[in-house]
């Protein structure tokens, strides 16, 4: 019997799944925003901003209190002194992305880190100057890539290679990525693709892409904004050169929080690798000697520029502690597959051809997110999205016509999926042409 065949309609079935869920207790560790009626929102937007851990306020308040009590001495005193504070996040963050010790650091923002990585890893020559990205890449990635191309004196019209879906399709075929790498391999300086595509929710074959790219002499990096904390990653063993990600989505660190960066160990101590430098990347044993010569720390820490914002790191630590307590990505991924499988089944049963799910139907090719388009002649996607918001469902709208729904395994329930689809069904029934 297939898993879909085991699903049943009705709220009792959803509640039964929740009752048997070993991760259900973690929902109470997060603040669920209230809806207008006083009930908790049906929050399905963790792919845009994760919910606040209830412990985050305590973690942040502890650092505010330390500042009040100790002032500058807080850099060196207390359970979590500020000077090495980023190090307290390193082990769990590395585990979540499959990094080895020293390969991961929490710093800056995603796009800032992408620029820092491209300073080191995009070294164009007349023969090899192209960068491969995907069609409909997240705009900030494309802006960064095109600006780097121009900075080096090249034209994106010549140096930007875009792999696209086939006509009439939303997803990009693995074979087409391989074909583009094969055709442009000798002129590609950098492959820069997402781990999970933000618009469609498609998981890319990062191991395969890295292998293909390296076989043709390309540097391979990934934007993991929608992958970190969402799907299992194994960056070190996949031999990825670098990766960047934000922490405010699935990692629940708060709006605009500090981002993450991975640099493979084989690059971490490369003396000849160019970089933009700052004092926080200097060898910590001699940093405060204030010497004139930059001596980088080994590993990803050597790309740090300035001392990080402690209050933001405190909020990240609160969330990472929950990930560790939950057992890391393996149990979360297991629940995520069941959540999205159940949600996909409910949508297909209830709406049929009146919607189009553009996220891959194969569970291993998607993360938490289901992206859908309304295909009904009776109402638009915007009409539906407005109704969902008014009914206490928080999803995510992406132009021109996609609604993204993301049940997150740390705090979403099967009941959330059921209630969302019931609200959708009622709207569909009430707005159908007769």
Regions found by a protein language model. Give the residues of each.
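Pyridoxal 5′-phosphate
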Residues: 1-434
